[in-house]
Amino acid sequence: RYPALEGIMIAGYATKFAQAIDLTILSELPNLHSLSVNICEGRGYLIDFSKFRLKEFSGAWFSHYQGLESLIELEVLRLSAYKAANLEALSHMSLLHTLVLWDSHVPSLAGIERCTRLKDMDLFRVKGLTDLSPLAQHPSLERLHLLSNRHLTQVQALNTCPKLRKLCIEKCKHVADIVTLEGATEIARITLDQVQSISFLPELPKLEFVYLEDVFDC
């Protein structure tokens, strides 16, 4: 009935239905490329993503949703409430260039290294995440924003990202090896908030912009 429809956004609070609503029916729209499902309580909805051919998805992930790993044509993923041991479910998304992960529990980024076109990445309030080692030598990562990752202690992997130009680290108080960023010599813009030291900044030859707030040791 709506052959030209390319994007759908569903938002709000889910109502208690007598029977769960299966949003998988939306996959029958032939030109649907973008889907946003921002529902505060998703028990009233079902989605099987293996039926979709999306380029963009945004929303909370509930345990009864299925088929995230099937979205192999995805280019943009904004995901919250995601709970998994790692990011292996994303490893087949070879076209993915933008990833936003927030309010989730993911102890390891393993799997993201196979998303070789990834350019932009935001990690906000990701519980359990201690290091960024799967990002080591990532060939295309250009921008990374880290916010309120309370368990994060290691960022040394960023030294080997050849295209990383924009870095923001905010409220990640327990990063112990931040001085090792002196090896990330391609960085041009950096924002640091509540970090242990900025002694490495003079070692960044391409630096164009610096924003500092609540630095513990200058």
Question: Where in the sequence are the language-model features?
Answer:
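Concave beta-strand-loop units of leucine-rich repeat
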Residues: 1-27, 31-67, 73-88, 92-108, ...
